[in-house]
Amino acid sequence: MNPLLSFKDVSKGFEDVQILNEINIDIEPGYFYTLLGPSGCGKTTILKLIAGFEYPDSGDIIYKDKPIGKMPPNKRKVNTVFQDYALFPHLNVFDNIAYGLKLKKLSKSEIKRKVTEALQLVKLSGYEHRQIQGMSGGQKQRVAIARAIVNEPEILLLDESLSALDLKLRTEMQYLLRELQSRLGITFIFVTHDQEEALALSDYIFVMKDGKIQQFGTPIDIYDEPVNRFVADFIGESNIVHGTMVEDFVVNIYGQNFDCVDMGIKENKKVEVVIRPEDISLVSQNDGLFKAKVDSMLFRGVHYEICCKDRKGYEWVIQSTKKANVGSEVGLYFEPEAIHIMVPGETEEEFDKRIESYEDYHHA
């Protein structure tokens, strides 16, 4: 089956600034996708190109096997939920949601039925006659989502839609968005710079930097096997250290050999090693793979964040549910599976091929 939407070598610039560089993406129907990256990486520009608010300088945008790069927004089966909601302040909730349906000249009874259903979906039944000015940020966001889904788009675009909400409301809206996507089966494309939000919501994530896709995959794939230092740093906290591959399944870190699960990398190849803070355990000095001194400890609610310095002066961050005494000598321990090897300069295609070879090896 062909993708619902594809970008084929799409580039876009504004004046002298290149925003997107030969972007290639495929969007399958019925999944929740997230474009994740820092400000200025080009993620919102991709959304604008899908919606038809901007046109590509080069390359093709294909929707259901037809090019739509120059198609006007009103001809696309796409709706957008903006960060600032973009609601009409002079209209009540019902009329805001019904606006697009009235333009389509649907009957009053059909409009009422669709608006009522949309309000039920976003858990705002009974709010039809409320004025927009008197609503909270979370309620306005739900109205904006209802206005989008009532038109039954095939793709729903969400541009930093939760960033203006406080933490509790944002969490509630995350559950609502996942529930809506699952129930309606609409393809969601969500833009955010918040990696925790991306991990919680997405079926698939595109990690972006400087107008290019750095990595595409499921949240678990990207978190567990980042393709490069940028992705490892951007998706969660990481201990990133330099190493050298000794042979298959053995990496040398700062002069000490460690078992790992990586293979297919040239011997003596310089690599970068990622070990997540939650994968490191504080143990007795005798039980540790190496020794370290506790420098500091912060309570983060669900865990303690403990900073240690090993005897060679390198810092390690550990997330633990157990306290540690600042100044104490401890052992640090991690399993071979906790070590993730990154090869500098490796393309995503080369990286994916290497990871697939591990799976083939273990299934052989």
UniProtKB/Swiss-Prot annotation:
It catalyses: ATP + H2O + polyamine-[polyamine-binding protein]Side 1 = ADP + phosphate + polyamineSide 2 + [polyamine-binding protein]Side 1. The keyword Membrane applies. Gene3D superfamilies: 2.40.50.100, P-loop containing nucleotide triphosphate hydrolases. It is found in: Cell membrane. ATP binds at G37, P38, S39, G40, C41, G42, K43, T44. Residues 5-235 form the ABC transporter domain. It is an enzyme of class 7 (translocase). Disulfide bonds: none annotated. GO terms for molecular function: ABC-type putrescine transporter activity; ATP binding; ATP hydrolysis activity. PROSITE patterns: ABC_TRANSPORTER_1, ABC_TRANSPORTER_2, POTA. Its main location: membrane. It is a peripheral membrane protein. Pfam families: ABC_tran, TOBE_2. Keywords: ATP-binding, Cell membrane, Membrane, Nucleotide-binding, Translocase, Transport. GO terms for cellular component: ATP-binding cassette (ABC) transporter complex. Transmembrane segments: none annotated. Its EC number is 7.6.2.11. InterPro entries: AAA+_ATPase (IPR003593), ABC_SmlMolc_Importer (IPR050093), ABC_transporter-like_ATP-bd (IPR003439), ABC_transporter-like_CS (IPR017871), Mo/tungstate-bd_C_term_dom (IPR008995), P-loop_NTPase (IPR027417), PotA-like (IPR005893), PotA_ATP-bd (IPR017879). Part of the ABC transporter complex PotABCD involved in spermidine/putrescine import. Responsible for energy coupling to the transport system. Belongs to the ABC transporter superfamily. Spermidine/putrescine importer (TC 3.A.1.11.1) family. NCBIfam families: potA. The complex is composed of two ATP-binding proteins (PotA), two transmembrane proteins (PotB and PotC) and a solute-binding protein (PotD). This is Spermidine/putrescine import ATP-binding protein PotA. It comes from Staphylococcus epidermidis (strain ATCC 35984 / DSM 28319 / BCRC 17069 / CCUG 31568 / BM 3577 / RP62A).
